[in-house]
Structures are given as C-alpha cells and as structure tokens.
Swiss-Prot record:
Reactions this protein catalyses: Hydrolysis of terminal, non-reducing beta-D-glucosyl residues with release of beta-D-glucose
Gene for this chain: bglM
UniProt-listed Enzyme Commission number(s): 3.2.1.21
Similarity section: Belongs to the glycosyl hydrolase 3 family.
Protein name in the entry: Probable beta-glucosidase M
Transmembrane segments: none
Function: Beta-glucosidases are one of a number of cellulolytic enzymes involved in the degradation of cellulosic biomass. Catalyzes the last step releasing glucose from the inhibitory cellobiose.
Length: 768
C-alpha cells in the first residue's frame, strides 16, 4: 500500500503480463464461481478475552452514532497531512479520527524518525526478544508522530516465489519462524500504544498481475492464488494465526484473488477463516485500491476501505434500507474499528492524528521528534544480528589489526540525497547502483535520520586504528594495491513493491567480485540483499575468503558491519531462506506465474506444490543447496549433546483438540504443551557467542522436517547451557480437511536439533 498521492500512476506502472485473447480464452469470471466457498453472514465481534473492556466502550460509542457517522468510519478520506490514510473525526463525540501509515520497518515520508532493519533482517536474527524490543521502540516513534495504526508487519508474502518482489518485507519462508517473530513484533509495537495492520492477507505471493489492469484495450484480472484447504492452514494461514493471537487490531487484505475471489471480498478467508475459525476481534482493512465490490465486500467481512471508497458511502445505508445488507453488519464494522482505538488506549493522551506527518516535508511544518536516544542500542543491535556469515576461509574474519584495507563496489557509499527514501520506481532494477542498500523499494521504504554507509564506518575505524584505507567504488575492474591486507567488495541485490525480480544474480556485480578476487588473495564480499541472492559464480573462488549476507540493516548499516568485521560483535545470524546452487533448483517456484492459455484474461497460479516450498522442497527432492535454511557461521564453535525428549502427561493427546470457546487465535487447546525437549550446547571455541538452536520435527505423512522450535542463547567460552523447547498441539498436528480440525496423528515422530535445517547432530523420536 502507499500514500494517496500518486496512487493512480503507481498502479499503472505495476508489473503486468497478459496473454492476447483467443477463441479459447475464458472471458467471464462466472466460469470460476464457487471455487471459493461462500461463508455468510459475517460474524460479529464478541469482545472476548482482552477485548472485553474495549468492546463495551465501543458499543456504547457506536450506539450514539448516526448512520452517516458509522459509514464515515469505514472509508478513508483526504486530510492535510502525510499519513498514508485517514479516517475522519467525529468532533461531537471527541473522536479525533485515525492516521494510518507505512510501514513495518519505520515511518516513511517524514522526518525525525529512524530507518529500522527490514523484516528479512529481523528474520535473519532469529531473535524473538530483539524482535519485540525493535517493535516497541519503533512503535514509540509512530506514537509520537500521531500515527494510530502502523501498516505492518508483513507475513504475506511468505516467500513462496524465489523472485518475489516483496519477500524482503516479511521475516521468513517458514511459517513457524515467521509466526513467532511477527507475534513478538506485534506485542512490541502495540505495547507502545500503536495498532498494527498486519499484511497481506492472504497468499499474496507475487507482484506480477497483483491488480486487475487494462492494456491495449484488454482487461486482465488479478492473478488467482489457488490453494487447497490443507496447504492454506499448514502454511499460509499459520503465521496469521499467530498474528491474531498476538492481538493485532487490524489485518490488511491483499490485492490478488484467492481461489478466484478477490482477497478483500472473499467470504471464506475473511468471514470463515479469520473471523470465525481464528476469532479475530479487530477490523479488516483493504490494501490501497483493493476494493472491487460494494455490498459484496462488506457482507464478505471487509470493515474499512483505504484510501477512500466510491462503492460504499451512502450505498451502505441504501443497502440497509433495501435489505441487501443488515444494519448489524454496519454496526459491527464501526464497533470493530472503535474497539481497536480503545484497545490501544488512544482515547486518552494520544497525540493529534498525523501531527508529526507533514504533507510535504520540504514545506514549513512543526518539528515532531519521533526518535529517541533510548532506541540507539536496540537500533544498532537489530542491525548487527541480521548479518549472516556464510563463508570464512581460514578464519579470515574477524580482521586482525590490518595495516591497510581496500574498499570496492557501488554498495559501499551513502546516497547523494535522501530522495531515494521517498521515491517510487517505475521499474525494478537488479541492483541499486548508486549507493548502499539499507531497505527495499515501495511502501515498505523508510526515512532514515542518517545513513552509516560501509565506507564511512570503515574510514572512521581506520582513523581510530591509525591504519590506512584505499577505495575505488566506481571501477568495474579496479587496481589493487598488493600491500593491502584485505579487499572488501560491496554489492547489493534490489527488490521493490510492484515488481517481481528479474533474476537472483546480476552479471555486473559478479564480474566485479571476480575481478577483485583475481588480484587480491583476501577478498571479503558483503551483499546487501533484498531477498535470495545466488553466489555460485564466485563462491568457490580461492581468493574469496569470506562472504556476508548483510540483508537490509537500516540506517546503522555501516556501524553494524564494522562491529562484526573487527570482532567486537560475533556473527549470530542465520538464513531465513535457502540459497540454491543454481536458479533452476527452485523449480516452478523460481518465477512468478504469468497469464497463459485459456486463462490469459484470468491468470491462475495453482499452489500445487502444497506445503513443499523452500527447504521442504529441497529436502523432498534431494537437492543439495549452496547454503541451507537456518545456516550461518560464527567466530566460535558450538557442540550439541544431551538430547532429552519428554512427553507432557497432563495434557490430552486425543486425535482432535478438546472443544472450547474460540479465543483470539482459535481453539486455545492448540497451544497445550504436548512435548518438552532439551539439549545441552557448549561453546568450545575461542570467543563468546550467540547460537540459534533449531528444532525440527518429522510429522507422519508430512515433510521430512519442519521447524518447530528455535532459541537464541548467549554462551561464554567453555560454558554449557541447557536449551529447552516446548511443543504445542498445533506444532505436532496436521490439518484434517474432512473434520476441519487439527489432527494429532498416532505414530512415530522424528525430532532433530542442531545448527541449521541440514546440520542436525542430535536426533530422537517419540510416539503418540
């Protein structure tokens, strides 16, 4: 989603493909009717659990509204501020309205705020506690700026398509990993009194054809994500279940179609899965311009349209009058919105909506300081921990008091201006050639208070050390001083909203690496990557001694990297995706789906692979990756021992969970602990470090391994710590499409614990 200004132009530029119509083309969407089951009526919010007080207040508030005031709450309006969207005020009842703004890694299009690390970077940290702290400090900036709702975080896309343009906004390709990190992120943000609108619900896995478009007089519908019930529950709905359980006050529905019904008027996904099965108490907001039906969308469970609506307004009251919509539906829409306002305690002491969001940052405006010195430590640490060291030949890193270093590559320098933080590109280049990459493009961009670029931070380090630095960041085949101790090469891999990537490598950057490596025996490569980046063209070069996937660290990029290069911090990041040896190893999930054959006007993307994406697919097909999911090196070594598996006897292991009233997140018994696992980890290396212990389970009739636990622990040199994992009923279950329940199967389950999805020194089993 995006600011109102420029919306039409942006949508017109979004990546679109179409097939010319033929006699065989399907020309009416009536062909697809019924593929997404109808679920009506839209359930009313119950105000259960932690929502009780907010709902009581909201119902009293809504009871005093006129029909027109209720309608006004359901659609955005223009306002003299820079918020991405606004809900109008109701002055007579002291409701000041709402400001909602991008994005999940810091505010966009404003000043006096920080540019935080992106979702993929947080995913690479594997640090739940840090994710919550990042959310809390980031949320406090939104609060000071008068932003009621943060448009994020992201768990859709999950990362099904390797070239997906927005994969970098999410945390991980694994639903369990993504779910735990989004849970902690939401808890942190909302603890600051700012609501989250978690996105994009659901199965929004490519940018190509995400919106309906007309080109040369040909109308092409948005792509349809066609998903079976089992895959939906076990993969794509999984992290959203954690979102609801965390209490997210809003969820943003997506652009594309789901089983040939648009995401923002799909009664199965909104009424059925979200509001009934998961017990969601907040409100559903459209992505910007994602409403395609009037009363059909409200009856399907949509509660708020952004940035405005031409299909609702007085049409809602007319529909109530003519009986095509129940008055209770409008009341529920308004109640959910106002209850969320109360739930965040924004009725008392919250700044005026949008007060710190100027419509034009270059015009005179009041300075509202969002950032705080209290955030500096968390800001830097969140940047540090998302770096992943994947090669370290002969312990090249950390650098050992070098007398001279040389820096090469376009990604080393800072930008010439901050305009990049505000712009929308009308295309998606393979790289950002003009400066270091701290964030991807589109509505997920953010506004840095400063940028610590790698070259700047390295020069500062050299000043402090009294050493020397040479640099040539523009040459493709630079000269290298033979006396240099290390050659640091900086490249990047760009991605943006609106477009899927054209590939996972770029020849120019690879050529730069090999050119330097041919002249320098100690070449260290840093990649700022907005998604998967292949390295097969040079990873085995004998002079490439170390490689870091630096992801998208935010404004502290250079400072964080220097902490790692010089050994003041020990790398602890792990990959939240699989890096293949060859692009073809991703198979049908490499490229986005394009319109073809009889579906030229109604693109169809069949998720026929089921749950087998990324490492699950590599395991199933026996493909050896370059670097597996969960992989990352350290400056120390960790030894695993003492696997202990103990079943919890006081919780039911019945086939289906005991019946219970639905709470936020679904049946509360899904979180009953069934199994406890513990392992001992010893730091047998030379320095203290953080290790991410990962637990995988082989569930009968499922993938070889699925992540079902991870803990990040600090271990001093020579010390041993015991790491414990608690596995709930959902963690060990599969979705029964007949019973429509989570099924705990009888049989033998495999348990694996170790350093990555393929480095698992401990293995055991248990039987249910």
């Amino acid at each position: 989603m995006h600011a109102i200004a420029g919306l039409t132009g942006f949508l017109a530029g979004v990546s679109l493909s179409y097939a010319a119509p033929t006699q065989e083309n399907i020309t009416s969407d009536a062909y697809f009717y019924g593929q997404s089951p109808a679920v009506y009526p839209s359930p009313e919010g119950t105000g259960s659990g932690a929502w009780a007080s907010a709902y009581e207040k909201a119902k009293a508030f809504v009871a005093n509204l006129t029909p027109e005031e209720k309608v006004n709450l359901t659609a955005g309006t223009d306002a003299d501020n820079g918020c991405s969207g606004n809900i109008p005020a109701i002055p007579r009842l002291n409701f000041p309205g709402l400001c909602v703004s991008d994005a999940g890694n810091g505010l966009r299009s404003t000043d006096h705020v920080n540019a935080w690390s992106s979702g993929i970077h947080t995913g690479a940290s594997w640090n739940k506690d840090l994710a919550q702290k990042r959310g809390l400090h980031m949320g406090s900036e939104y609060h000071k700026k008068g932003v009621n709702v943060l448009l994020g975080p992201v768990v859709g896309p999950l990362g099904r398509i390797a070239e997906g343009g927005r994969n970098w906004e999410g945390f991980s390709v694994d639903p369990y990993h993504s779910g735990l990190l989004v849970y902690e992120t939401i808890r942190g943000i909302q603890a600051a009194g700012v609501g989250t609108s978690t996105k994009h619900y659901i199965a929004n896995e490519q940018e190509t054809n995400r919106n309906p478009e007309s080109t040369d007089g040909i109308d092409v519908a948005a792509v349809s994500s066609n998903i079976d019930d089992k895959t939906m529950h076990e993969l794509y709905l999984w992290p959203f279940q954690d979102v609801v359980r965390a209490g997210s006050v809003s969820i943003m529905c997506s652009y594309q179609r789901i089983n040939n019904s648009y995401g923002c008027q799909n009664s199965k996904t909104l009424n059925g899965l979200l509001k009934t099965e998961l017990g969601f108490q907040g409100y559903v907001m459209t992505d910007w311009g994602a409403q395609h039906g009037g009363i059909a969308s409200s009856n399907a469970g949509l509660d708020m349209v952004m940035p405005s609506s031409t299909l609702w307004n007085s049409n809602l009251t007319d529909a109530i009058a003519n009986g095509t919509m129940e008055a209770s539906r409008l009341d529920d829409m308004a109640t959910r919105i106002i209850a969320s306002w109360y739930q965040m305690n924004q009725d008392a002491g919250f700044p005026s909506p949008g007060i710190g969001m100027p419509a034009d940052v270059y015009a005179p405006h009041q300075a509202i300081i969002g950032k705080s010195s209290d955030s500096r430590k968390v800001l830097l640490q969140s940047a540090i921990e998302g770096h992943v060291l994947v090669k370290n030949k002969n312990n090249t890193l950390p650098l050992k008091s070098p007398e001279m270093i040389s820096v090469f590559g376009y990604d080393a320098k800072g930008p010439d201006s901050l305009g990049f933080a505000l712009e929308w590109l009308s295309y998606s280049p393979a790289i950002q050639p003009n400066h270091t990459l701290i964030v991807g493009g589109g509505s997920g961009g953010n506004s840095p208070a400063y940028i610590s670029a790698p070259l700047d931070a390295l020069q500062q380090q050299v000043i402090e050390d009294g050493s020397s630095i040479l640099w040539n960041i523009s040459a493709q085949d630079p000269e290298v001083d033979p006396n240099t101790d290390a050659c640091l090469v900086f490249i990047n891999s760009y991605a943006t909203e609106g477009y899927d990537r054209a590939g996972l490598v770029d020849e120019g950057s690879d050529e730069l690496v090999t050119n330097v490596a041919s002249k320098c025996s100690n070449t260290i490569v840093t990649i700022h990557n907005a998604g998967i980046r292949l390295v097969n063209n040079w990873i085995d070069h004998e002079n490439v001694t170390a490689v870091i996937f630096a992801h998208l660290p935010g404004q502290d990029s250079g400072r964080a990297l220097v902490e790692l290069l010089y050994g003041r911090s020990n790398p602890s990041g792990k990959l939240p995706y699989t890096v293949a040896k060859n692009a073809d190893d991703y198979g049908a999930l490499l490229h986005p789906k394009l319109p073809e054959g009889q579906y030229g006007l109604f693109p169809q993307d069949d998720f026929s692979e089921g749950v087998y994406i990324d490492y699950r697919a590599f395991d199933k097909q026996g493909i050896e990756p370059q670097f597996e999911f969960g992989f990352g090196l350290s400056y120390t070594t960790f030894d695993y021992s003492g696997l202990n598996i103990g079943q919890v006897s006081d919780n039911s292991t019945s086939r289906y969970p005991p019946s219970a009233a639905i709470q936020e997140g679904g049946n509360p018994h899904l979180w009953d602990v069934i199994l406890r696992v513990s392992v001992d980890i010893t730091n047998s290396g030379p320095v203290a470090g953080d290790e991410v212990a990962q637990l995988y389970v082989g569930i009968p009739n499922g993938p070889v391994r699925q992540l079902r636990g991870f803990e990040k622990v600090n271990i001093p040199v020579g010390q041993t710590v015991t790491v414990e994992f608690a596995l709930g009923r959902r963690d060990l279950s599969t979705w029964d499409v007949v019973a429509q329940e989570w099924l705990l199967q009888s049989g033998t389950y495999q348990v694996y614990v170790g350093r990555s999805s393929r480095d698992l020194p401990l293995q055991g089993e248990f039987t249910i």
